[in-house]
């Protein structure tokens, strides 16, 4: 005001053309807005800096470990030689932010998952117990089928189904949307969009696909892993440890069992016979009180639904994101879909999958 009085016109103004004006008002409001602006972009931190946050350094000469879904993994070590797994995640998938909290809850419940050692959610940095690199998929390619590890994986899955929901609820951990008609429909559409390239299905085939959700939605809900396949099961001394459970949600237990029984990554000799063994042990682990036929039917219904989703993922990642390693599994996924759909009487789905498997094999 003194300046204006001394030299009229010396203080200029600015006319804001925006539709509205927000006055920050208080110092507290200003500090809150400033903090939001200065907040780090989740997952943008350099790997070396992420390791330093918790006193670790990258392991010399070791390449990054395969990741995906907006995550990257590295083995890190402390000066005393102890190692851990460093996970840097971004906001590509909303479930990435929940991995640490779900992991804490499941570990506290006694389920075999990596212990969460540290986390900075703002930076998108998670430090996990190092359980090694051996997964069930790798073991299945050896001459002897890794039955002890498979049995252990099913038993840990049983613990997850019995204890998981209460564990995350007690810990106040929010979960992704539960399985229901909406999610089952999305999985089917994912298959149509990516495997069939959006080709319109005839009404009878659409109706047959829709019956899968009706049968699964009527079952009791437990906490399901949602991606219970051999690459997401680490093995140490024949004991299984579950990883990549960030998509866990309430759903039908058969979805998880079917994910392993008909896992397209499991292509070892005599896999058809091993599927019977895996199904039998799954029934024991589930403490199933119904008939053998009902369990088998629901397992194959769930496998058909699951494989629609899995094949959709292989096609999407392979054709739209250039991941030839995923596209290579599409023919086996379609062959497994043919078997599962046939065994639960979904003949139209089985016929479609068989035709697609043949066409995919020829195109390769």
Task: Tell me what each language-model feature is.
Residues 70-77, 86, 160, 210-257:
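Active-site acidic catalytic loop and adjacent metal/ATP-binding pocket
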Residues 1-8:
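A short, conserved alpha-helix in the catalytic core of glycosyltransferases
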Residues 65, 74-186, 190, 196-197, ...:
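ATP-binding pocket architecture of kinase catalytic cores
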Residues 312-364:
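ATP/Mg2+ or Mg2+-diphosphate-binding catalytic cores
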Residues 99, 146-153, 184, 202-209, ...:
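Hydrophobic packing residues in well-ordered alpha-helices of helical domains and bundles
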Residues 189-198, 253-289, 303-321, 333-340:
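Active-site activation/catalytic loop segments of kinase-like enzymes and analogous catalytic loops
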Residues 176-179, 291-302:
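All-alpha amphipathic helical-bundle segments outside canonical DNA-binding/catalytic cores
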